[in-house]
């Protein structure tokens, strides 16, 4: 069977060779960094391992373990004021500091992956070679192509995404090497290769799902000279350079968000059992598919369209305010507003807002989002039931995708999954490099907790 988009990969190896430089590759640089980091971790735990770092409340245990420090995640930390920081850098920092494609104003997600893994900003040449390396790995095995082609079109795109990634387990270099008895010191190297193989294949998988479910099933070819986001957009079926630039921004700002969210934690948990990157990421994608995690931007759009129909295009302050109060008084929330940690407007929202203002300030849905932004924080503050009345990233992302013709909101979580893979896989490589332990927290029954609480309270 001939698959058109696979043919171009024969050209990628020659592209890599002709564009190679004396600068270190990502794997070479990581191999220099991780032994130092691993030793630092060992020494830190040795010296301070008995230090108590937190008290846990019963309500936290029953409240989804919210706020309990119980995991290590190197790539990002969420600051209540500055928002997400990638290796210490804010959204504004990475937009300024990370390499960009020629003529683009947005950072390349490949550059962020380098930053997440090493803590360093790569050079332009290093990122271009990483882009080419990823695209050289994009070819799907025939059984995965056939599998996707045979899935029913009404099967949710996220289910198809997870199935395809799981089926790629057949290609796992780590699983094969582990079965042959490799040394623990080599775990990270095979995990690295699997992770880059998987990252390279994700745009093809995502685009194939989109073309199969929503279009005619036909796809173009991977372009070895194009960056990651451009290949993704082109394979989906668009040649709009502004859409490509949006996708660079989208993939970058959605790539990592600490390790406690469902997709990151699930992948970390499964990976701690030494499951391959394919199985680890697939588990996270299944978590991301849950409506409480990855469906938020789709729910925002559904709510916006309902609002738009209700107000008959009257976006005045009074009309918007009334609709917001009606939403809250009916026991519902305003989707896209509020955050568990942030106490100000999500910088990711602001980055997307600026993109919209620069490219389509008169787009009707954007004007509606802007009107809500002017009114909602005041309404939520007066309502008094949220600690953060400001918009988060989900309040905006779906509107931008709508503008560029990607109308099928059930596909949006697939794009979220492609993006989140950068952060998840960077941490998995790091976990294998430092010899992270398998997760095994303690659980109790409610009766046992009652007993514990009774004993504690009797001593007060």
Curated annotation (Swiss-Prot):
Q: Which reaction does it catalyse?
A: oxaloacetate + acetyl-CoA + H2O = citrate + CoA + H(+)
Gene name in the database record: CIT2
Outcome of residue 293 to G? Prevents the stabilization of the enzyme by oxaloacetate and impairs the catalytic activity
What top-level branch of life does the organism fall under? Eukaryota
Q: Which organism is it from?
A: Saccharomyces cerevisiae (strain ATCC 204508 / S288c) (Baker's yeast)
Q: Specify the protein name.
A: Citrate synthase, peroxisomal
- Main localization is cytoplasm
List UniProt keywords, sorted A-Z. Cytoplasm, Isopeptide bond, Peroxisome, Phosphoprotein, Transferase, Tricarboxylic acid cycle, Ubl conjugation
Q: Which InterPro entries match?
A: Citrate_synth-like_lrg_a-sub, Citrate_synth-like_sm_a-sub, Citrate_synthase, Citrate_synthase_AS, Citrate_synthase_euk, Citrate_synthase_sf
| Compartments it resides in | Cytoplasm; Peroxisome
Briefly state the modifications made to the protein after translation: Ubiquitinated by the E3 ubiquitin-protein ligase complex SCF(UCC1), which leads to its degradation by the proteasome. Ubiquitination is prevented by oxaloacetate, suggesting the existence of an oxaloacetate-dependent positive feedback loop that stabilizes CIT2.
What's the further remark here? Citrate synthase is found in nearly all cells capable of oxidative metabolism. Present with 2310 molecules/cell in log phase SD medium.
The pathway noted for it is: Carbohydrate metabolism; tricarboxylic acid cycle; isocitrate from oxaloacetate: step 1/2
The family database entries (PANTHER family) matched by this protein are listed as: CITRATE SYNTHASE, CITRATE SYNTHASE, MITOCHONDRIAL
The record lists the effect of residue 294 to A/V as: Leads to a decrease of the catalytic activity and the ubiquitination efficiency
């Amino acid at each position: 069977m001939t698959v058109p988009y696979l043919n171009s990969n024969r050209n990628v190896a020659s592209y890599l060779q002709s564009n190679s430089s004396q600068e270190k590759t990502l794997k070479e640089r990581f191999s220099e960094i991780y032994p130092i980091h691993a030793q630092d971790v060992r020494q830190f735990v040795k010296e301070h391992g008995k230090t108590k770092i937190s008290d846990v409340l019963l309500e936290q245990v029953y409240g989804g373990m919210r706020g309990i420090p119980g995991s290590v995640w190197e790539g990002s930390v969420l600051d209540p004021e500055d928002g997400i920081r990638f290796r210490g850098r804010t959204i504004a920092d990475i937009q300024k500091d990370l390499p960009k494609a020629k003529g683009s104003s947005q950072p390349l997600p490949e550059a962020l992956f380098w930053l997440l893994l090493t803590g360093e900003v790569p050079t332009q040449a290093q990122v271009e070679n990483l882009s080419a390396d990823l695209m050289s790995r994009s070819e799907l095995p025939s059984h995965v192509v056939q599998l996707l082609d045979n899935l029913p079109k009404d099967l949710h795109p996220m289910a198809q995404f997870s199935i395809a990634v799981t089926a790629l387990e057949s290609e796992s270099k780590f699983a094969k090497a582990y079965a042959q008895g490799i040394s623990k010191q080599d775990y990270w190297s095979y995990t690295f290769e699997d992770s880059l193989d998987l990252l390279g294949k994700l745009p093809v998988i995502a685009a194939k799902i989109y073309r199969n479910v929503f279009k005619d099933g036909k796809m173009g070819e991977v372009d070895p000279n194009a960056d990651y986001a451009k290949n993704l957009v082109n394979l989906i079926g668009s040649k709009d350079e502004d859409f490509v630039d949006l996708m660079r921004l989208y993939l970058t700002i959605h790539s990592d968000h600490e390790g406690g969210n469902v997709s990151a934690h699930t992948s970390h948990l499964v990976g701690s059992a030494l499951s391959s990157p394919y199985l680890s990421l697939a588990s996270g994608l299944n978590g991301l598919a849950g409506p409480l995690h990855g469906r938020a931007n789709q729910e925002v759009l559904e709510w916006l369209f309902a609002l738009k129909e209700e107000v008959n295009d009257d976006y005045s302050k009074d009309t918007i305010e009334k609709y917001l109060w009606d939403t809250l008084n009916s026991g519902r929330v305003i989707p896209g507003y509020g955050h568990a940690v942030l106490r100000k407007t999500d910088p990711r929202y602001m980055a997307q807002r600026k993109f919209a203002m620069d490219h389509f300030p008169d787009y009707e849905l954007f004007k509606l989002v802007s009107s809500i932004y002017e009114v909602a924080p005041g309404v939520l503050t007066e309502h008094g039931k949220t600690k953060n009345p400001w918009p988060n990233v989900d309040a905006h992302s779906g509107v931008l995708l709508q503008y560029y013709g990607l109308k099928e909101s059930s596909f949006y979580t697939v794009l979220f999954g492609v993006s989140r893979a950068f952060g998840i896989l960077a941490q998995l490589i790091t976990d294998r490099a430092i010899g992270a332990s398998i997760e095994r927290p303690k659980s109790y029954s409610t009766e046992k907790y009652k007993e514990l609480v009774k004993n504690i309270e009797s001593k007060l």
